[in-house]
Curated annotation (Swiss-Prot):
Belongs to the phosphohexose mutase family. It comes from the Bacteria. Binds 1 Mg(2+) ion per subunit. One of its GO terms (biological process) is carbohydrate metabolic process. This is Phosphoglucosamine mutase. The modification Phosphoserine is found at S101. InterPro entries: A-D-PHexomutase_a/b/a-I, A-D-PHexomutase_a/b/a-I/II/III, A-D-PHexomutase_a/b/a-II, A-D-PHexomutase_a/b/a-III, A-D-PHexomutase_C, A-D-PHexomutase_C_sf, A-D-PHexomutase_CS, Alpha-D-phosphohexomutase_SF. It catalyses: alpha-D-glucosamine 1-phosphate = D-glucosamine 6-phosphate. The lineage of its organism: Bacteria, Bacillati, Bacillota, Bacilli, Bacillales.
Length: 450
């Protein structure tokens, strides 16, 4: 990735790193690159999550788009996958989502989608970066009727909800579903969707105020929903992240059902229905060893990619696969949408429950997980973790002790100044000990001095 774009668009602290000035330039440069071959007044959709900085960045971004002659349709607050779907459904030339997903409220981000609803290629992002770095802005500056326009398309939310309902064959009558919307983009979507599907609903994290997105709620804090599920005696819980492209489930006894287990459950069901393309699922290197052992027992093939849903989607498109995702809850059903979609994944999961008549705890128990621990360490330069000799040495030592019965993954985050240390081993005690041993060296060698 380059100077501006990470694995999921441009991100930074809003108003200091991701400034209105940068948003304006991203609108101009990004809009130009994505629409220059379209003709006069190409259409671009713009949406945001619930962060307090969203409207500021939206205004600046739209000004940039309009300045190169683009017709902007504002969707307001809607999930990232909602934007991806509507891009194709509305015949737009491109779309832009303003969100930092699961990151804290101080952060924000800008990510583009092409006319096909997919995230941009590396080449497209590189071209935008080159324009951003050009000293003089020589892009067109139309005037009069050559300028773009701005209109609102808030009814797009309902069109997206109606589409989601068409992807399953069952309603959810008789199910009590607990929803955690992370005080984010699904707050105005999830309850309407599940009510339309005749479910009994209890919701939390659905009162955004601009400052509380992901704050102790959502897919990065599933323990909050676990307690809520038990309190409300719900059959299942679904926790989304700030922009709605992830989901983590909770079963009826309060156990967390992560992305690996959701993918496993859905892969098994799709295979039984003859709907799993090429009998293959795509995952990342972060998926649990138990996930792969479970797939092997079912004789389902797997393809592994680097961490990041964009890499999962690339592999799915290249291999004509229709199911893939990440342990973190990004799950892609490529028959139905072009990116991870928390609402879509949630209804697919509950559809399996309804079709099989099984509780979520029963379905999840069919995949056994290895104990796993993940440490996130804030560092001064995350990209040097792979060539630090002391870090490499402790990893080699731990892997030798494991003797093949576990694994270690140490990598820089694609979206934050963090090094992620992930360890799986035969027992929880070994997992904790190995993870702390490696993390201690990473902290000693690389951690920021607070």
């Amino acid at each position: 990735m380059g100077k501006y774009f990470g694995t999921d668009g441009v991100r930074g602290v809003a108003n200091s790193e991701l400034t209105p000035e940068l948003a304006f330039r991203l609108g101009r440069m990004g809009g130009y690159v994505l629409t220059r071959h379209v003709g006069e007044h190409p259409r671009v959709l713009v949406a945001r999550d619930t962060r307090i900085s969203g409207e500021m960045l939206e205004s600046a971004l739209i000004a940039g788009l309009v300045s190169v002659g683009i017709e902007v349709m504002r969707l307001g607050v809607i999930s990232t996958p909602g934007v991806a779907y509507l891009t194709k459904a509305q015949g737009a030339s491109a779309s832009v989502m303003i969100s930092a997903s699961h990151n804290p409220v101080d952060d924000n981000g800008i990510k583009f989608f092409g006319s096909d609803g997919f995230k941009l290629s590396d080449d497209q992002e590189e071209e935008i970066e080159q324009l951003l770095d050009t000293a003089e802005d020589t892009l067109p500056r139309p005037s009069g009727e050559g300028l773009g326009t701005v209109s609102d398309y808030f009814e797009g939310k309902q069109k997206y909800i109606q589409y989601l309902k068409q992807t399953i064959e069952n309603d959810f009558n008789g199910y009590h579903i607990a929803l955690d919307c992370a005080n984010g983009a699904t707050s105005g979507l999830a309850t309407h969707l599940f009510a339309d599907l005749d479910a009994d609903i209890s919701s939390m994290g659905a009162s955004p105020n601009g400052l509380n997105i992901n704050d102790g709620v959502g897919s990065t804090h599933p323990e909050a929903l676990a307690a809520f599920v038990l309190d409300k005696k719900a059959d299942v819980g679904l926790a989304f992240d700030g922009d709605g492209d992830r989901v983590i489930a909770i079963d009826e006894i309060g156990q967390i059902v992560d992305g690996d287990k959701i993918m496993f459950i859905c892969a098994k069901y799709l295979r039984e229905q003859g709907l799993l393309n090429n009998n293959t699922i795509v995952s990342t290197v972060m998926s649990n060893l138990g996930f792969y052992k479970g797939l092997k027992e079912l004789e389902i093939e797997d393809v592994q990619t680097a961490v990041g849903d964009r890499y999962v989607v690339e592999a799915m498109r290249e291999g004509n696969y229709n199911l893939g995702g990440e342990q973190s809850g990004h799950i892609i059903f490529l028959d139905h949408n072009t990116t991870g979609d928390g609402l879509l994944s949630g209804i697919q999961l509950i559809n399996v429950m309804k079709a099989t008549g099984k509780k979520l705890s029963e379905l999840a128990a069919e995949m056994k997980t290895f104990p796993q621990k993940l440490e996130n360490i804030r560092v001064s330069d995350k990209n040097h973790v792979t060539d630090n000799p002391k870090v490499s040495k402790v990893i080699d030592e731990v892997e030798a002790e494991m003797a093949g019965n576990g694994r270690v993954l140490v990598r820089p985050s694609g979206t934050e100044p963090l090094v992620r240390v992930m360890v799986e081993a035969a027992t929880k005690e070994e997992t904790d000990e190995y993870c702390e041993r490696i993390s201690a060296v990473v902290r000693s060698e690389m951690a920021l001095n607070d």
